[in-house]
Amino acid sequence: MVVATTIALYASPPSSVCSTPHQISCDLDLTSRSSSTSSSMASSPQKPIVGGLSSLFSSASVKSSSSSSCSYSTAVDEFSSLRYDRSDDLKDLSFSSSFGYSPAKFVNSFRRDHQSPISVLHGPVSCSCSPPMRMSRDRNLDGSFRLGASRLFNGFVRKALGSCVDYELGSDSGLVDELTFPMEVDTIKPYARDLLRRAQLRHKIFNDESVIKAFYEAEKAHRGQMRASRDPYLQHCVETAMLLANIGANSTVVVAGLLHDTVDDSFMSYDYILRNFGAGVADLVEGVSKLSQLSKLARENNTACKTVEADRLHPMFLAMADARAVLIKLADRLHNMKTLYALSPVKQQRFAKETLEIFAPLANCLGISTWKVQLENLCFKHLYPNQHNEMSTMLEDSFDEAMITSAIEKLDQALKKAGISYHVLCGRHKSLYSIYSKMLKKKLTVDEIHDIHGLRLIVDNEGDCYKALGVVHSLWSEVPGKLKDYITHPKFNGYQSLHTVVMDNGTVPLEVQIRTQEMHLQAEFGFAAHWRYKEGGCKYSSFVLQMVEWARWVVTWHCEAMSKDRSSISSSDSIKPPLQVFRLTLEDCPASYKPNSSQDGPVYVIVIENDKMSVQEFPASSTVSDLLSRAGPGSSRWSMYGIPAKEELRPRLNQIPVSDLKWKLKMGDVVELTPKIPDESLTEYREEIQRMYDRGLAFSRPGTMVGWGS
């Protein structure tokens, strides 16, 4: 009976949401525990070769269900298994207290089908136009009353957290004493309560029931963990989630933001999150983990300094995970960059370089311009501190927010008076890094940069563009030679707009861009999108382009709710999705983007050889055999014993040995090349080692002196 009781205690996860490992229920059902234990010990079938990084970092549903409970701090970091290193993204933590158990992983309970490595938006995206439905706190979704605290999700279907159903929140709905799920109030640290209350004051989404639950799960998972800045790790989780909330992310994304490091840095597993928060959140957290592991590989191999390979990583990040997971990773990196001062100068340089070459362009691909600007400026500060200080001093008085606001008000009134309606009127300051880059590229001084301040106006039609241009020139004096008519004379990539530079108050130049809705959509999501035309001429396949455009659109659409841009048109007439661009995906909208089997462009594959990673481009339909041909059928290498050996390369595709060399490579595949020593070389090695051993015995005999004759 004692043995059976012990098995029951340690074969199941805690029964309540925030229980500690010290609270053990004595109400045991030995029969049911025994069966669940045996089922959890059953081995799962061997995983087939599946393309993509999603196969490299195996999901919980295809891992072996036989796992032992062990402390996280004793885990072995083995490069061949590509385990995640907690040093990634500023995780220099000290574990003053942590949980000494790992919840059982009920792998066979929730089996998921293998998905293609190229999948975007795994979880459902809300596109409902109906108002949010109020959910009673006393009833389940199916109308039944809750029978107890453990029935929180009774009646919820899988992926309910990703649906368009939302709560109508009250101002005090986030208090602990109103929670409908069990919470051991005595175990909650005072700093955690204060952190939650401050977050609720900053954004209303932190009053959401699922967000509060995720907050306390994150507190439990990261309890005792500290960052290099000596702040509690929980604070980083909250700041990451806050960044997501501030750009309009829904509760599913915010919950995943709170839990984004739990799989890598705590006892939590994919199945634990799946049981408590649903597949939508679990998939996002798993996606962030995969991105972190790829980021670590790239940083260890200095990929950021290899321009072409860094460019290939951008579509690969979007190919291997949900676009919203990329968004969470960007928020994680942005907050890490804000606290980069806590690391050594060497680490600051390394992280800043990676961020500038990989993450800032990725934010640009997704259309999150505010994050792109912040990331670039923070990188500029750490990579070029002297130039950053100099630019900051020179432009300290130039960044006049009041001037931009005044210009918007002035133009708005003039447009109304002229009877010109518009969709968007917004202003911006050019970032420090953008100004510095433009000065270097075009060899200009600060006074010669005329687009430090800018306005953008989006109107109905082409005729209104020219009418609005006349209004602008009537308000401010035009700078001669700075009018560019890209409507009549489009750029080579199809970009169309009117650009003009005027002088505000006679001293400060102000650039004004005027375009129609169609021109704006083409510039942001279509062929003219500037993220496509990075220097170096890196060209993406049509499938990758469509995938990135869709991800960019979804992120922009989700963030539109937080836009503060002025409009003279009702919201029902605002900019609509570009139906002609995403015709192929609207059939399943808002489901995830489905890969196109007729991919005709290049694929990017990660090749690991001699513990070094490279991102290589292969034509469509390339095979493992083609990769080996490029690497060479074999190479003559000199061994440590001076014996030349012809080594054959033995490939592993996504951690699985390859027997069929005709297997086609897919976007995001990881191929490890290890040398296979022929039998004749092994014979020579053994003979040489035997001779060395014999010489060693001769030297060690009594009376024998090395280097002296007898």
Swiss-Prot record:
Gene3D superfamilies according to UniProt: Beta Polymerase, domain 2 (3.30.460.10), Hypothetical protein af1432 (1.10.3210.10)
Domain of life: Eukaryota
All copies of domain HD, residue ranges: 233-337
Transit peptide, residues from-to: 1-63
MF (Gene Ontology): ATP binding; GTP binding; GTP diphosphokinase activity; kinase activity
Protein family (similarity comment): Belongs to the RelA/SpoT family.
Protein name in UniProt: Probable GTP diphosphokinase RSH2, chloroplastic
Origin species: Arabidopsis thaliana (Mouse-ear cress)
